[in-house]
Amino acid sequence: MSLLPVVMALLLTAACAYQPDAASGDGSRELTVFAAASLGNAFPEIADAFVAEHPGASVTFNFAGSQRLRTQLDFGARADVFASADRRQMDLAVEAGLIAGDPTSFAGNSLVVIVPLPGTTAELNSAVKIQRLEDLAGNGVKLALALPEVPAGRYALALLRNLEAQYPALEPGYASRVMDNVVTLEPNVRGVFQKVALGEVDAGIVYRTDAATEYAAGKVQVVSIRQ
């Protein structure tokens, strides 16, 4: 499903449902969007396109981990759109009566392992060079993951377990050995990316979209998971 038209439709629906007493006298609409941190690149561009097509509208973003956003909503924060990175947090929001209508799936993503780009200061200062998945379980490796409470962290652990089960080259206990090398758990996937880009860790697991931006191209590279 294409990201642009679906998110545009979500914003338009929110604008139509906007409470009249919250609108300014000139008929403008200010929409508040709570979105997973991994959407921080795509959503502002979509919002710009939406505002261009709907004069008088404006969009304000709150980007954070999906679990944190759902908790904020649970404690009374107001939002017109909640874009979660996983179904679990959306289901919890629905169960709590925080969501109007039925949730819509608008995009998919995948996880990748990133390391500092060769030749950068971060890579040159790294004592460990990660070239294969096996290397993540080596001695002295420093790995960054997102907190297990947020989707990226939960998905990363599932990825490691799945890799161990699917690839014979990864010996039994691989996932546990990799987890032993985790030195920081970040509140969202953007934090993981920054740790790698700055050379504070040797590798991290992030969404593919985070590694595909123009900014990322000059900072990190993706380690192939093909064995």
Feature annotation, model-predicted:
Residues 2-15:
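Bacterial N-terminal signal peptides
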Residues 110:
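Active-site-adjacent helical/loop segments in soluble small-molecule enzymes
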Residues 97-104:
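Central helical "cap/lid" subdomain
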